[in-house]
Amino acid sequence: MLHSPIEADAVIIGAGPVGLFQVFELGLLEIKAHVIDSLPEAGGQCIELYPDKPIYDIPAVPVCTGRELTQNLLKQIEPFGAQFHLGQEVRTLEQQADGRLLIGTSQNQYFLSKTVFIAAGVGAFQPRKLALEGIEALEDKHIFYHVKHPEQFSGKKIVICGGGDSALDWALFLVEKAASVTLIHRRDDFKAAPKSIAKMRELCASKQMQLLIGQITSYEAQDDHLKEIVVTDIDGKTQALPVDDLLIFFGLSPKLGPIAEWGLDIERKQLVVDTEKFQTSIPGIYAVGDINIYPGKKKLILSGFHEAALAAFAAAAYLNPEKQIQLQYTTTSPKLHKALGVGSPTFE
Protein backbone atom coordinates (compact mmCIF):
# COMPACT_ATOMS: atom_id res chain seq x y z
CA MET A 1 0.00 0.00 0.00
CA LEU A 2 1.67 3.20 -1.21
CA HIS A 3 -0.52 5.72 0.60
CA SER A 4 -2.45 5.76 3.85
CA PRO A 5 -6.05 4.78 3.17
CA ILE A 6 -8.87 7.28 3.27
CA GLU A 7 -10.92 6.53 6.37
CA ALA A 8 -14.68 6.64 5.91
CA ASP A 9 -17.97 5.69 7.46
CA ALA A 10 -19.39 4.62 4.09
CA VAL A 11 -18.05 3.80 0.65
CA ILE A 12 -20.46 3.31 -2.25
CA ILE A 13 -19.25 1.24 -5.19
CA GLY A 14 -21.16 2.44 -8.23
CA ALA A 15 -22.37 5.91 -9.24
CA GLY A 16 -25.51 4.93 -11.11
CA PRO A 17 -28.95 6.19 -10.02
CA VAL A 18 -29.19 3.79 -7.08
CA GLY A 19 -25.66 4.57 -5.89
CA LEU A 20 -26.42 8.29 -6.08
CA PHE A 21 -29.67 7.90 -4.17
CA GLN A 22 -27.76 5.85 -1.58
CA VAL A 23 -25.71 9.01 -0.95
CA PHE A 24 -28.96 10.89 -0.28
CA GLU A 25 -30.42 8.33 2.11
CA LEU A 26 -27.15 8.07 4.03
CA GLY A 27 -26.89 11.86 4.13
CA LEU A 28 -30.28 12.16 5.79
CA LEU A 29 -28.88 9.93 8.53
CA GLU A 30 -25.72 12.05 8.86
CA ILE A 31 -23.48 9.49 7.18
CA LYS A 32 -21.07 10.95 4.65
CA ALA A 33 -20.08 8.76 1.71
CA HIS A 34 -17.29 8.29 -0.78
CA VAL A 35 -18.40 7.06 -4.21
CA ILE A 36 -16.21 4.99 -6.55
CA ASP A 37 -17.05 4.12 -10.15
CA SER A 38 -15.12 2.60 -13.04
CA LEU A 39 -16.76 4.98 -15.53
CA PRO A 40 -15.41 8.51 -16.07
CA GLU A 41 -18.66 10.22 -15.02
CA ALA A 42 -21.57 9.54 -12.70
CA GLY A 43 -24.77 8.00 -14.01
CA GLY A 44 -23.96 4.35 -14.70
CA GLN A 45 -26.15 2.67 -17.31
CA CYS A 46 -28.30 5.81 -17.57
CA ILE A 47 -25.40 7.78 -18.99
CA GLU A 48 -23.51 5.04 -20.81
CA LEU A 49 -26.39 3.15 -22.40
CA TYR A 50 -29.41 5.44 -22.71
CA PRO A 51 -28.54 9.07 -21.85
CA ASP A 52 -31.18 10.53 -24.17
CA LYS A 53 -33.83 7.82 -24.11
CA PRO A 54 -37.01 8.50 -22.13
CA ILE A 55 -37.67 6.83 -18.77
CA TYR A 56 -41.33 6.70 -17.76
CA ASP A 57 -41.41 4.83 -14.43
CA ILE A 58 -39.83 7.25 -11.95
CA PRO A 59 -42.53 8.27 -9.40
CA ALA A 60 -43.94 11.79 -9.91
CA VAL A 61 -41.74 12.26 -12.99
CA PRO A 62 -43.89 11.50 -16.05
CA VAL A 63 -40.83 11.32 -18.30
CA CYS A 64 -37.12 12.07 -18.11
CA THR A 65 -33.99 10.96 -19.89
CA GLY A 66 -31.16 9.04 -18.27
CA ARG A 67 -29.09 12.20 -18.40
CA GLU A 68 -31.81 14.28 -16.74
CA LEU A 69 -32.31 11.69 -14.01
CA THR A 70 -28.59 11.68 -13.29
CA GLN A 71 -28.41 15.48 -13.22
CA ASN A 72 -31.37 15.68 -10.84
CA LEU A 73 -29.89 13.08 -8.50
CA LEU A 74 -26.54 14.88 -8.46
CA LYS A 75 -28.33 18.11 -7.57
CA GLN A 76 -30.35 16.33 -4.88
CA ILE A 77 -27.24 15.00 -3.14
CA GLU A 78 -25.24 18.25 -3.29
CA PRO A 79 -25.95 19.14 0.38
CA PHE A 80 -24.23 15.99 1.60
CA GLY A 81 -20.78 16.60 0.09
CA ALA A 82 -20.08 13.12 -1.21
CA GLN A 83 -16.58 12.69 -2.62
CA PHE A 84 -16.40 11.03 -6.03
CA HIS A 85 -13.54 8.84 -7.24
CA LEU A 86 -14.32 8.17 -10.90
CA GLY A 87 -12.49 6.27 -13.60
CA GLN A 88 -11.23 3.62 -11.22
CA GLU A 89 -12.42 0.09 -10.62
CA VAL A 90 -12.58 -1.44 -7.16
CA ARG A 91 -10.25 -4.43 -7.28
CA THR A 92 -10.10 -5.63 -3.68
CA LEU A 93 -12.38 -5.65 -0.66
CA GLU A 94 -11.07 -7.24 2.51
CA GLN A 95 -12.45 -7.28 6.03
CA GLN A 96 -9.88 -6.24 8.63
CA ALA A 97 -9.41 -7.55 12.16
CA ASP A 98 -11.31 -4.59 13.62
CA GLY A 99 -14.29 -5.25 11.31
CA ARG A 100 -13.57 -2.35 8.97
CA LEU A 101 -13.32 -2.94 5.25
CA LEU A 102 -10.22 -2.19 3.18
CA ILE A 103 -11.04 -1.24 -0.41
CA GLY A 104 -8.38 -0.99 -3.12
CA THR A 105 -8.87 0.44 -6.61
CA SER A 106 -7.18 0.16 -9.99
CA GLN A 107 -5.57 3.58 -9.34
CA ASN A 108 -3.90 2.32 -6.15
CA GLN A 109 -6.29 4.35 -4.03
CA TYR A 110 -7.28 2.73 -0.74
CA PHE A 111 -10.20 3.30 1.60
CA LEU A 112 -10.74 1.97 5.11
CA SER A 113 -14.48 2.09 5.67
CA LYS A 114 -16.87 0.94 8.36
CA THR A 115 -19.56 0.10 5.77
CA VAL A 116 -19.65 -0.59 2.04
CA PHE A 117 -22.59 -0.33 -0.33
CA ILE A 118 -22.24 -2.23 -3.59
CA ALA A 119 -24.43 -0.47 -6.14
CA ALA A 120 -22.51 -1.68 -9.15
CA GLY A 121 -25.49 -2.45 -11.37
CA VAL A 122 -24.64 -5.59 -13.29
CA GLY A 123 -20.95 -5.14 -12.56
CA ALA A 124 -18.22 -2.97 -14.03
CA PHE A 125 -18.84 -1.94 -17.63
CA GLN A 126 -16.11 -2.68 -20.15
CA PRO A 127 -16.35 -1.69 -23.83
CA ARG A 128 -16.77 -4.56 -26.27
CA LYS A 129 -13.58 -4.41 -28.27
CA LEU A 130 -12.61 -4.97 -31.87
CA ALA A 131 -11.27 -8.52 -32.04
CA LEU A 132 -8.20 -8.15 -34.25
CA GLU A 133 -4.72 -9.31 -33.28
CA GLY A 134 -2.43 -6.55 -32.05
CA ILE A 135 -5.08 -3.85 -32.30
CA GLU A 136 -4.78 -3.01 -28.60
CA ALA A 137 -1.43 -1.30 -29.28
CA LEU A 138 -3.34 1.48 -31.04
CA GLU A 139 -5.90 2.04 -28.28
CA ASP A 140 -6.16 5.64 -27.06
CA LYS A 141 -3.86 6.66 -29.91
CA HIS A 142 -5.91 6.01 -33.05
CA ILE A 143 -8.53 3.56 -31.81
CA PHE A 144 -11.04 4.81 -29.26
CA TYR A 145 -13.89 3.22 -27.30
CA HIS A 146 -14.81 6.48 -25.54
CA VAL A 147 -14.59 10.02 -26.90
CA LYS A 148 -13.03 12.42 -24.41
CA HIS A 149 -11.65 15.11 -26.72
CA PRO A 150 -13.75 15.37 -29.89
CA GLU A 151 -11.69 18.28 -31.18
CA GLN A 152 -8.80 15.89 -31.89
CA PHE A 153 -10.76 14.40 -34.80
CA SER A 154 -11.08 17.68 -36.72
CA GLY A 155 -9.74 17.37 -40.26
CA LYS A 156 -9.19 13.61 -39.90
CA LYS A 157 -10.48 10.63 -41.86
CA ILE A 158 -12.77 9.05 -39.28
CA VAL A 159 -14.33 5.59 -39.31
CA ILE A 160 -17.04 4.82 -36.76
CA CYS A 161 -18.20 1.27 -36.03
CA GLY A 162 -21.54 0.43 -34.43
CA GLY A 163 -25.27 0.68 -34.87
CA GLY A 164 -26.50 2.25 -31.65
CA ASP A 165 -27.02 5.76 -30.35
CA SER A 166 -23.36 6.39 -29.54
CA ALA A 167 -22.17 5.45 -33.03
CA LEU A 168 -24.78 7.56 -34.80
CA ASP A 169 -24.53 10.50 -32.42
CA TRP A 170 -20.78 10.79 -32.94
CA ALA A 171 -21.08 10.26 -36.70
CA LEU A 172 -23.58 13.11 -36.93
CA PHE A 173 -21.49 15.31 -34.64
CA LEU A 174 -18.21 14.77 -36.49
CA VAL A 175 -19.52 14.95 -40.04
CA GLU A 176 -19.02 18.73 -40.11
CA LYS A 177 -15.64 18.64 -38.36
CA ALA A 178 -13.78 15.65 -39.80
CA ALA A 179 -12.31 15.42 -43.30
CA SER A 180 -14.53 12.39 -43.85
CA VAL A 181 -16.82 10.16 -41.80
CA THR A 182 -17.60 6.54 -42.62
CA LEU A 183 -20.06 4.55 -40.54
CA ILE A 184 -19.66 0.77 -40.53
CA HIS A 185 -22.29 -1.61 -39.20
CA ARG A 186 -22.69 -5.33 -39.69
CA ARG A 187 -26.23 -4.94 -41.00
CA ASP A 188 -28.47 -2.22 -42.37
CA ASP A 189 -30.54 -2.10 -39.20
CA PHE A 190 -29.85 0.36 -36.41
CA LYS A 191 -30.82 0.51 -32.73
CA ALA A 192 -30.77 4.27 -32.39
CA ALA A 193 -33.15 7.21 -32.22
CA PRO A 194 -35.28 7.32 -35.41
CA LYS A 195 -34.34 10.97 -36.01
CA SER A 196 -30.65 10.07 -35.89
CA ILE A 197 -31.12 7.21 -38.34
CA ALA A 198 -33.06 9.45 -40.74
CA LYS A 199 -30.42 12.19 -40.53
CA MET A 200 -27.61 9.69 -41.15
CA ARG A 201 -29.34 8.34 -44.27
CA GLU A 202 -29.93 11.89 -45.50
CA LEU A 203 -26.23 12.71 -45.12
CA CYS A 204 -25.24 9.50 -46.90
CA ALA A 205 -27.61 10.29 -49.78
CA SER A 206 -26.01 13.72 -50.16
CA LYS A 207 -22.53 12.11 -49.95
CA GLN A 208 -21.57 14.07 -46.84
CA MET A 209 -20.76 10.77 -45.13
CA GLN A 210 -20.58 7.11 -46.09
CA LEU A 211 -22.28 3.97 -44.78
CA LEU A 212 -20.70 0.56 -45.27
CA ILE A 213 -22.45 -2.68 -44.31
CA GLY A 214 -19.93 -5.24 -43.15
CA GLN A 215 -17.22 -5.81 -40.58
CA ILE A 216 -13.60 -4.79 -40.21
CA THR A 217 -11.53 -7.90 -40.88
CA SER A 218 -7.99 -6.50 -41.01
CA TYR A 219 -6.00 -3.30 -40.69
CA GLU A 220 -2.66 -1.80 -41.58
CA ALA A 221 -0.60 0.30 -39.19
CA GLN A 222 2.81 1.93 -39.43
CA ASP A 223 4.85 3.54 -36.66
CA ASP A 224 1.89 3.39 -34.26
CA HIS A 225 -0.32 5.13 -36.81
CA LEU A 226 -3.44 3.58 -38.29
CA LYS A 227 -3.27 3.68 -42.09
CA GLU A 228 -6.00 1.48 -43.52
CA ILE A 229 -8.78 -0.92 -42.63
CA VAL A 230 -10.37 -3.66 -44.70
CA VAL A 231 -14.14 -4.09 -44.56
CA THR A 232 -15.71 -7.40 -45.58
CA ASP A 233 -19.39 -7.48 -46.47
CA ILE A 234 -21.89 -10.33 -46.05
CA ASP A 235 -20.98 -11.74 -49.49
CA GLY A 236 -17.28 -11.84 -48.69
CA LYS A 237 -16.34 -8.86 -50.83
CA THR A 238 -13.63 -6.65 -49.37
CA GLN A 239 -12.99 -2.94 -49.52
CA ALA A 240 -9.90 -1.10 -48.28
CA LEU A 241 -10.47 2.24 -46.62
CA PRO A 242 -7.87 4.83 -45.58
CA VAL A 243 -8.35 5.99 -42.00
CA ASP A 244 -6.71 8.22 -39.41
CA ASP A 245 -8.80 7.37 -36.36
CA LEU A 246 -11.23 4.57 -35.60
CA LEU A 247 -14.09 4.94 -33.10
CA ILE A 248 -15.63 1.69 -31.85
CA PHE A 249 -19.09 1.62 -30.28
CA PHE A 250 -20.02 -2.04 -29.93
CA GLY A 251 -21.69 -1.42 -26.60
CA LEU A 252 -20.61 -2.17 -23.08
CA SER A 253 -20.17 -5.60 -21.58
CA PRO A 254 -21.06 -5.89 -17.88
CA LYS A 255 -18.67 -8.07 -15.93
CA LEU A 256 -19.01 -9.08 -12.30
CA GLY A 257 -15.23 -8.93 -12.27
CA PRO A 258 -13.41 -8.65 -8.92
CA ILE A 259 -16.68 -8.72 -6.95
CA ALA A 260 -16.68 -12.50 -7.43
CA GLU A 261 -13.44 -12.70 -5.41
CA TRP A 262 -14.64 -10.85 -2.31
CA GLY A 263 -16.04 -13.86 -0.45
CA LEU A 264 -19.69 -12.80 -0.75
CA ASP A 265 -22.52 -15.25 -1.35
CA ILE A 266 -23.39 -15.16 -5.05
CA GLU A 267 -26.35 -16.59 -6.94
CA ARG A 268 -26.57 -16.36 -10.73
CA LYS A 269 -23.81 -13.70 -10.77
CA GLN A 270 -25.68 -11.53 -8.26
CA LEU A 271 -25.13 -10.85 -4.58
CA VAL A 272 -27.48 -12.55 -2.15
CA VAL A 273 -29.05 -10.15 0.37
CA ASP A 274 -31.75 -10.18 3.01
CA THR A 275 -34.78 -7.96 2.45
CA GLU A 276 -34.72 -6.28 5.85
CA LYS A 277 -31.28 -4.67 5.63
CA PHE A 278 -30.11 -5.55 2.10
CA GLN A 279 -26.98 -6.80 3.78
CA THR A 280 -24.78 -9.38 2.07
CA SER A 281 -23.25 -12.42 3.73
CA ILE A 282 -20.59 -10.18 5.31
CA PRO A 283 -21.76 -7.73 8.02
CA GLY A 284 -21.37 -4.10 7.05
CA ILE A 285 -21.48 -4.82 3.32
CA TYR A 286 -24.77 -4.01 1.61
CA ALA A 287 -25.85 -4.54 -1.99
CA VAL A 288 -28.52 -2.45 -3.69
CA GLY A 289 -29.87 -2.20 -7.21
CA ASP A 290 -29.36 -4.64 -10.07
CA ILE A 291 -26.32 -6.26 -8.42
CA ASN A 292 -28.40 -8.02 -5.75
CA ILE A 293 -30.83 -10.92 -5.74
CA TYR A 294 -33.61 -12.00 -3.40
CA PRO A 295 -37.04 -13.66 -3.78
CA GLY A 296 -39.28 -11.44 -5.89
CA LYS A 297 -36.43 -9.18 -7.04
CA LYS A 298 -37.36 -6.75 -9.82
CA LYS A 299 -34.60 -4.90 -11.64
CA LEU A 300 -36.18 -1.46 -11.56
CA ILE A 301 -34.67 1.89 -10.58
CA LEU A 302 -37.66 2.33 -8.27
CA SER A 303 -36.83 -0.93 -6.47
CA GLY A 304 -33.22 0.18 -6.08
CA PHE A 305 -34.31 3.43 -4.43
CA HIS A 306 -36.37 1.45 -1.89
CA GLU A 307 -33.42 -0.85 -1.20
CA ALA A 308 -31.09 2.13 -0.69
CA ALA A 309 -33.40 3.61 1.95
CA LEU A 310 -33.57 0.41 4.00
CA ALA A 311 -29.84 -0.25 3.60
CA ALA A 312 -29.09 3.25 4.91
CA PHE A 313 -31.15 2.71 8.06
CA ALA A 314 -29.50 -0.68 8.57
CA ALA A 315 -26.06 0.89 8.23
CA ALA A 316 -26.94 3.66 10.68
CA ALA A 317 -27.86 1.03 13.26
CA TYR A 318 -24.69 -0.93 12.44
CA LEU A 319 -22.51 2.16 12.90
CA ASN A 320 -24.29 3.24 16.10
CA PRO A 321 -25.50 0.07 17.84
CA GLU A 322 -26.25 1.91 21.10
CA LYS A 323 -28.29 4.62 19.43
CA GLN A 324 -31.94 4.39 18.49
CA ILE A 325 -32.33 5.49 14.88
CA GLN A 326 -35.34 7.75 14.59
CA LEU A 327 -37.40 7.92 11.41
CA GLN A 328 -37.75 11.57 10.43
CA TYR A 329 -39.63 13.12 7.54
CA THR A 330 -38.24 15.72 5.17
CA THR A 331 -41.62 17.47 5.25
CA THR A 332 -41.48 18.31 8.96
CA SER A 333 -38.03 17.71 10.45
CA PRO A 334 -36.03 20.91 11.19
CA LYS A 335 -32.94 18.73 11.51
CA LEU A 336 -33.36 17.38 7.98
CA HIS A 337 -34.21 20.83 6.67
CA LYS A 338 -30.90 22.07 8.07
CA ALA A 339 -29.02 19.15 6.51
CA LEU A 340 -30.68 19.85 3.16
CA GLY A 341 -30.00 23.56 3.39
CA VAL A 342 -33.66 24.54 3.20
CA GLY A 343 -35.80 26.60 5.51
CA SER A 344 -38.43 24.93 7.67
CA PRO A 345 -41.90 25.70 6.37
CA THR A 346 -44.42 27.54 8.53
CA PHE A 347 -48.06 26.58 8.60
CA GLU A 348 -50.87 28.97 9.43
Curated annotation (Swiss-Prot):
It is an enzyme of class 1 (oxidoreductase). Its cofactor is FAD. The keyword Hydrolase does not apply. FAD binds at residues 37, 45, 50, 90, 125, 290, 331. Its EC number is 1.18.1.2. InterPro entries: FAD/NAD-bd_sf (IPR036188), FAD/NAD-binding_dom (IPR023753), Fd--NADP_Rdtase_type_2 (IPR022890), Ferredoxin-NADP_redctase_2 (IPR050097). It catalyses: 2 reduced [2Fe-2S]-[ferredoxin] + NADP(+) + H(+) = 2 oxidized [2Fe-2S]-[ferredoxin] + NADPH. Keywords: FAD, Flavoprotein, NADP, Oxidoreductase. PANTHER family: THIOREDOXIN REDUCTASE 1-RELATED-RELATED. This is Ferredoxin--NADP reductase. It comes from Polynucleobacter asymbioticus (strain DSM 18221 / CIP 109841 / QLW-P1DMWA-1). The lineage of its organism: Bacteria, Pseudomonadati, Pseudomonadota, Betaproteobacteria, Burkholderiales.
